[in-house]
Amino acid sequence: MPLQYQSGFGNDWATEALPGALPAGRNSPQRCPYGLYAEQLSGTAFTAPRAENRRSWLYRIRPAAQHRPFEPFDGAARWLSDFGAAPVTPNQLRWSPLPLPDAPTDFIEGVQTWGGNGGPGEHGGVGIHLYAANRSMQGRYFYNADGELLIVPQQGRLRLATELGIIEVEPLEIAVIPRGVRLRVDLPDGQARGYMLENFGAALHLPELGPIGSNCLANARDFQTPVACYEDIEGDFELIAKFTGGFWRAAIGHSPLDVVAWHGTHAPYKYDLRHFNTIGSISFDHPDPSIFTVLTSPSDTPGTANMDFAIFPPRVLAMENTFRPPWFHRNVASEFMGLIHGVYDAKAEGFAPGGASLHNCMSGHGPDADTFEKATAADTSQAHYIRDTMAFMFETRRVIRPTAQALASAQLQSDYYECWQGLNKHFDPAQP
């Protein structure tokens, strides 16, 4: 049976897998229907402003506290939160796609950290990861106490069985798992690869639209949150926790995905990037890439995000007498890019689906020589249709510190800088 979802963003949801499982008129009755336990999951402080407050009430078969003591877990050794172990270079960096594993590897085992900043203790910054896996999580569940997860599949579907219901995402869709939500990751296609951002800061929001108006970019109605769905199974399972940068394991005698009903605002969701309503210039110039923002994590500085997630989807370029590709740039923010599908319009070669690039604070970047020559000779009286593409960017206010494993990776392209060396000198003071 097809999975069911609730439509909207930031709603106060209410859903039950059994009729009457949600208590009427109160959150914590003396006795819950069906003999369930009431439990609140708080994603923000109790006193956070109402518009920012994130919490959900769960009605579950057993409380989340019921498990054996945690002990250290070493099965996620490549998922890191220490971003100060390797020196930071101002060089532009690019990587080829991560290969799929040969040995059996589930999602938790297959995460590899490529860089980040801040950390769980700062309640700010991000971790940037790649993942490659070839088996579903077996007898294992996971939650992240350090931050929310933004998952960007590039190859293969993910079935995210969470406490609050089931989400299935495919390439060109994204999923967000809030801080603390327990889940199991299954691979319907047998293997999967993609990108993941770990947000240590404020929860992701839709960006303000300002003069754009009340519509466009990612519209709230296109986000989907799961309906209640529970597992009532007993056995020898393990619960993996990411806590203050480390990983911990606890034995648990039942599935923790046993929430029969829930209501609230702290919940996972998915979004189809193909629904993004792209905005662009219909006169001249290429606008700033902020017009492509899907989600943003605000910081304590107005107008400056902890992190932005932007995409570069299929679109029509109609600007006349304009250099249409993304322009040459140096940015106070740091930019990590990935390619989900197709070709990125600023790079003719070398940036493949599943690959990644990093342009840190004030490191010059922009179109390669081939792209520049073609764009400066193009007929801009005709519209240009970019159809076969889906690139994305994680942009952060802080420098992204690459990990030692990213810098030592066989996928690192040591010749990336060469893509700009072919840019010719055209300056002639006698020819305005």
Curated annotation (Swiss-Prot):
Class in the EC hierarchy, top level: oxidoreductase
Positions that bind Fe cation: H329, E335, H365
GO biological process, one term: L-phenylalanine catabolic process
Family to which the UniProt record says this protein belongs: Belongs to the homogentisate dioxygenase family.
Record key words, sorted: Dioxygenase, Iron, Metal-binding, Oxidoreductase, Phenylalanine catabolism, Tyrosine catabolism
Pfam families reported in the protein's UniProt record: HgmA_C, HgmA_N
Catalytic activity: homogentisate + O2 = 4-maleylacetoacetate + H(+)
Subunit structure: Hexamer; dimer of trimers.
EC number annotated for this UniProt entry: 1.13.11.5
Residues engaged in binding homogentisate: Y344, H365
Function: Involved in the catabolism of homogentisate (2,5-dihydroxyphenylacetate or 2,5-OH-PhAc), a central intermediate in the degradation of phenylalanine and tyrosine. Catalyzes the oxidative ring cleavage of the aromatic ring of homogentisate to yield maleylacetoacetate.
Pathway(s) where this gene product acts: Amino-acid degradation; L-phenylalanine degradation; acetoacetate and fumarate from L-phenylalanine: step 4/6
GO molecular function annotation: homogentisate 1,2-dioxygenase activity; iron ion binding
Cellular component terms (Gene Ontology): cytoplasm
Protein name: Homogentisate 1,2-dioxygenase
PANTHER family: HOMOGENTISATE 1,2-DIOXYGENASE (PTHR11056:SF0)
Cofactor: Fe cation
InterPro entries: HgmA_C, HgmA_N, Homogentis_dOase, Homogentis_dOase_bac, RmlC-like_jellyroll, RmlC_Cupin_sf
Catalytic-site annotation from UniProt: H286 (proton acceptor)
